[in-house]
Structures are given as structure tokens and as C-alpha cells.
Amino acid sequence: MKSYYVNKNKQANGDHEVHLNDCRYFPDADNRKYLGQFDNCADAVKESKKTYSQSNGCKTCCPSCHTS
């Protein structure tokens, strides 16, 4: 399982992006929330949506969950 985080700061389109901890776009400590360990990004995005309804996977580290 991998560790996933969500960026507390939304993107220009309103999305809060979900990242793996080794992503090159990994948010700074003050700007991220730990989501937990998951087998896939879909479960991590689902968890993120409990806090941020407009959540999306990072295009770089979670491309299969990137929708916008």
C-alpha cells in the first residue's frame, strides 16, 4: 500500500489534488493533509472527498485518477 496526501490549497479550477508522498509536486508540510495508506488512488480520492468534495488525482503521480 502507498501513502496518499491531499493538497489543502485548491488549484485554479477548484480541485484539491491527491498526491503520493514521492510526487515531484508533493505539497509543503503546511499545505498537505495525510489521507492514509491505500491500494489505489481511487480509494485515496474517495477519502479526500470526505473533506474536499472537489478532489482529483494528480496528473503526474495519480494519472488514472486525474479527471480535470
Which sequence ranges carry the predicted segments?
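Short aromatic-glycine-(Arg/Gly/Cys) micro-motifs in beta-strand/loop hairpins
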Residues: Y5-R32, S68
